C-alpha cells in the first residue's frame, strides 16, 4: 500500500514537472513566435516601403520622360521646308488635270488634303504621290480627299539627342522671349511676326527638382507659337533665314485654310532653358 502511495506521489511530481516544462516550452515558443512575427512584419513593412519608394521614383521619372517625348515631337525648320516643298510638288499633277487645292492640314504624323474640281474641268480620280508613296482618294463628283498621308513632320535634332540620352543645350527662356518680343516689335505686318500663344511652362518641374540626376531632367520649358505665312517653301525659308535659336523651334501643325491663296498657318512650340 505504501509503495502504491509512493508511486502515486512520484507520478504526481512527474506530471507537475511535465506541466511546468510544457508551460515553459509554450512560453518560449510564444516568445520566439512573437519576435519572429515582429521581425517578419518589420521586414515586410521595409519591403513594402522600398517598393513604394521605387514605384514613386519610377512614376516620377516616367512622367519626366513622357513630358520630353511629347515636347520634342515636331519638325525642325529644315524639315518644315522639305515638307512644304513636297506639298507644292505633289499638287502639280492635280492642278494640271483640273483640280485646285482647297485645304490641307498636317500634324507630326499625317496630312489630309482636299482638292476641288475647277469649273468646266473633266473629273478624273487619281492617286496622290507624296514622299514617293501613293495614296488613293476618297472622292465625290467634284472633290478628291486624301487622308492619313504620312507627313514626315516628326524629325528634328532634339528628339534624336533625346532618344540617345545625350546632353541637349538650349537658349534660356528669358533670352528667347526677349528676341521674339524684340523681333515682333520691329515688324508691322502680322504675317511677319511670331505670335506667342502660350508662355513657356514645365508640368514636371517638381519631379525634375526631386531627381536632378535623372538622365532626362533637362530643366526645359515649352511655349506655343503660331506663324501665318506663305506656303511657298522659298518664301518660308527666307522668313526663317538668319533667325537665331532655330533649334528651339519645332513645328507641330501646318494648315492651309479654305478660300486662302497659298497661305498657311504654322503651329509650333519653342523650347528653352528655365
Question: What residues fall within each predicted segment?
Answer:
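Primarily periplasmic coiled-coil/stalk helices
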Residues: 33-82, 164, 183, 190-201
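Generic detector of bulky aromatic hydrophobic side chains
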Residues: 3-4, 10, 14, 42, ...
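Short helical patches
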Residues: 1-10, 37, 44, 173-176
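N-terminal positive-inside, membrane-proximal cytosolic segments immediately preceding the first
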Residues: 1-28
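Generic intrinsically disordered, low-complexity segments enriched for polar/acidic and small residues
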Residues: 1, 31-37, 211
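Periplasmic/lumenal scaffold domains of single-pass inner-membrane subunits
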Residues: 85-274
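Generic surface-pattern signal
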Residues: 6-13, 62, 69, 185
Amino acid at each position: 500500500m505504501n509503495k502504491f502511495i509512493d508511486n502515486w506521489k512520484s507520478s504526481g511530481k512527474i506530471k507537475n514537472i511535465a506541466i511546468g516544462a510544457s508551460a515553459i516550452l509554450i512560453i518560449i515558443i510564444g516568445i520566439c513566435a512573437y519576435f519572429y512575427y515582429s521581425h517578419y512584419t518589420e521586414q515586410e513593412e521595409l519591403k513594402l516601403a522600398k517598393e513604394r519608394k521605387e514605384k514613386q521614383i519610377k512614376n516620377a521619372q516616367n512622367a519626366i520622360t513622357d513630358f520630353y517625348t511629347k515636347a520634342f515631337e515636331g519638325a525642325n525648320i529644315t524639315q518644315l521646308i522639305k515638307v512644304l516643298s513636297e506639298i507644292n510638288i505633289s499638287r502639280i499633277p492635280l492642278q494640271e488635270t483640273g483640280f485646285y487645292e482647297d485645304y490641307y492640314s498636317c500634324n507630326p504624323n499625317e496630312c489630309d488634303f482636299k482638292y476641288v474640281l475647277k469649273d468646266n474641268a473633266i473629273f478624273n480620280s487619281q492617286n496622290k504621290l507624296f514622299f514617293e508613296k501613293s495614296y488613293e482618294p476618297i472622292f465625290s463628283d467634284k472633290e478628291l480627299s486624301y487622308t492619313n498621308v504620312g507627313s514626315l513632320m516628326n524629325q528634328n535634332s532634339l528628339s534624336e539627342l533625346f532618344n540617345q540620352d545625350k546632353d541637349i543645350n538650349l537658349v534660356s527662356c528669358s533670352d528667347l522671349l526677349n528676341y521674339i518680343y524684340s523681333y515682333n516689335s520691329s515688324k508691322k505686318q502680322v504675317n511677319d511676326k511670331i505670335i506667342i500663344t502660350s508662355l513657356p511652362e514645365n508640368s514636371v518641374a517638381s519631379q525634375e527638382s526631386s531627381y536632378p540626376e535623372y538622365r532626362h531632367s533637362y530643366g526645359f520649358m515649352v511655349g506655343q507659337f503660331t506663324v501665318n505665312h506663305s506656303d511657298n517653301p522659298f518664301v518660308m525659308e527666307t522668313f526663317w533665314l538668319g533667325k537665331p535659336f532655330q533649334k528651339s523651334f519645332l513645328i507641330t501643325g501646318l494648315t492651309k485654310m479654305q478660300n486662302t491663296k497659298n497661305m498657311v498657318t504654322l503651329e509650333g512650340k519653342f523650347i528653352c532653358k528655365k
